[in-house]
């Protein structure tokens, strides 16, 4: 039965992540990069300056620019950076990392554009909260006739929260890492749902479900507070560990880069399979890159809309750093660590691949390296679960007219999905996530292309002041 379900999911995944969507994602990023004259490079230093500034240029909003970036990073830096990169390289070869970086580079302009539009078209909800996101810039920017597209986006946003980035993949990644550390041989098992699971999976799942239930009741302000403390710490700890691996194995880096580039263009495949190998690397690299940095799927604009600013461009610059930090820095380090240690072709799956890279690459006993990775993954995934609860609730607010009874009921469903996640197979979890992520991106990319003139005009107007 599970085999049949996985086969069906894989076919749907191949359909969603076929050539049209890959071209659409890359083309949108390239088009916006050209229209904005490479703003992600030209204004990168200014973006970092704004990120570290505590100043706000207006009273509208609920959280600071740094708080919004941390909320967005808390939702983007998750299992995608550790497990997603590993699954992409295992499935698509080392070349998947190349396409992940390419998509992120042009996707930075996409992230800038969507967060700029979120500020420009945000509104005040009936309960007094500042709200915004793709559903509002589709409706207000493209016109009432496009409200159906906004609703489609919101529906897929809820599904991504429940079935994609928000719950299954994160909790599954956490419990897999915990199990890999405490009971790798599954010595202590229990029979559940017709299958055997380690007690570590069950216990970790229950504990994390309780923590999630506690935090999401606090709403955005508590999520933002948690994110601002946890995200910088967990990102720094993970980056330091990855840098140590790269420094200790620096002689292997040139060979790894060559292998990544050759794999990206199918150079190692036989002549007839070169194109297929290249397409597989593109598909897995871009899909898992989108999973990780969320550029183009429309999630970050929901957090950006709550920022205390009246300048859409300013927040667009800060928000685009999420893609730089998440993929161009963290995912690249993960991918290089996996390739230079050779852990990707050892027949391992999911978190075990990155764990193997840390065990081989770090100068510590295997248990210590596995523990470091487990801690990073727990923090990464936990904050992603919190961030996506907020995102999906805003989508639900839009669909239901801010019906709080529905939202409260949804929170229990969300918590239930967190509880279920540990008992799903790794392949099913990631395939489902890829499918709903791709479907969520389509209406947002359409809106970004339609409203590119607004983005360019706002950008020119802002920088004309300097």
Give the positions of each predicted feature:
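N-terminal alpha-helical transmembrane segments of multi-pass membrane transport
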Residues: 1-79, 89-96, 107, 419, ...
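Alpha-helical membrane segments and immediately flanking helix-loop junctions
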Residues: 58-91, 117-141, 152-155, 159, ...
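Flexible loop linkers connecting adjacent transmembrane helices
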Residues: 38-65, 87-89, 93-97, 109-145, ...
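Membrane-interface loop-to-helix entry segments
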Residues: 24-31, 36-48, 171-178, 199-249, ...
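Transmembrane helix-loop junctions in multi-pass membrane proteins
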Residues: 4-5, 36-40, 80-85, 161-174, ...
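Helix-loop-helix module between adjacent transmembrane segments
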Residues: 28, 32-33, 74, 103-128, ...
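Extracellular/periplasmic helix-exit of transmembrane alpha-helices
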Residues: 33, 114-122, 126, 241-259, ...
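Membrane-interface alpha-helices at helix entry/exit sites of multi-pass transporters
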Residues: 57-62, 94-102, 140-152, 186-194, ...
């Amino acid at each position: 039965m599970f085999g049949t379900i996985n086969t069906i999911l894989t076919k749907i995944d191949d359909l969603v992540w076929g050539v049209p969507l890959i071209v659409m994602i890359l083309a949108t990023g390239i088009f916006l990069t050209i229209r904005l004259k490479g703003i992600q490079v030209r204004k990168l230093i200014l973006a970092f300056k704004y990120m570290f500034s505590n100043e706000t240029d207006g009273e509208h909003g609920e959280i600071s620019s740094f708080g919004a970036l941390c909320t967005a990073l808390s939702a983007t830096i998750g299992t995608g950076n550790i497990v997603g990169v590993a699954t992409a390289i295992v499935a698509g070869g080392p070349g998947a990392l190349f396409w992940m970086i390419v998509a992120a580079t042009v996707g930075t302009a996409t992230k800038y554009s969507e967060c700029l539009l979120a500020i420009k078209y945000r509104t005040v909800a009936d309960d007094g909260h500042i709200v915004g996101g793709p559903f509002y810039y589709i409706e207000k920017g493209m016109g009432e006739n496009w409200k159906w597209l906004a609703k489609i986006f919101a529906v897929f946003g809820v599904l991504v929260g429940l079935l994609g980035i928000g719950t299954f993949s994160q909790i599954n990644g956490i419990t897999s890492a915990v199990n890999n550390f405490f009971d790798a041989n599954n010595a202590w098992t229990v029979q559940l749902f017709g299958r055997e699971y380690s007690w570590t999976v069950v216990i970790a799942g229950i504990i994390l479900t309780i923590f999630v239930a506690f935090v999401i009741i606090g709403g955005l302000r508590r999520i933002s507070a948690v994110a601002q403390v946890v995200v910088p710490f967990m990102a720094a700890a993970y980056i330091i560990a990855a840098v140590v691996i790269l420094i200790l194995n620096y002689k292997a880096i040139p060979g790894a880069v060559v292998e990544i580039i050759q794999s990206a263009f199918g150079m190692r495949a036989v002549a007839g399979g070169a194109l297929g190998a290249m397409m597989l690397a593109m598909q897995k690299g871009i899909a898992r890159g989108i999973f990780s940095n969320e550029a183009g799927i429309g999630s970050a604009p929901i957090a950006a809309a709550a920022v205390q600013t009246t300048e859409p461009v300013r927040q667009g610059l800060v928000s685009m750093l999420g893609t730089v930090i998440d993929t161009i820095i963290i995912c690249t380090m993960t991918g290089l660590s996996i390739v230079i240690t050779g852990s990707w072709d050892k027949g391992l799956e999911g978190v075990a691949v990155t764990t193997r890279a840390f065990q081989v690459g770090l100068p510590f006993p295997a248990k210590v390296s596995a523990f470091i990775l487990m801690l990073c993954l727990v923090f990464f995934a936990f904050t992603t679960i919190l961030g996506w609860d907020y995102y999906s609730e805003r989508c639900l607010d839009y669909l239901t007219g801010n019906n709080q009874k529905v939202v409260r009921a949804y929170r229990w469903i969300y918590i239930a999905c967190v509880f279920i996640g540990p008992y799903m197979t790794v392949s099913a979890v990631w395939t489902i996530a890829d499918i709903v992520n791709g479907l969520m991106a389509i209406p947002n990319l359409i809106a970004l292309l339609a409203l590119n003139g607004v983005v360019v005009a706002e950008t020119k107007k802002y920088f004309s002041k300097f």
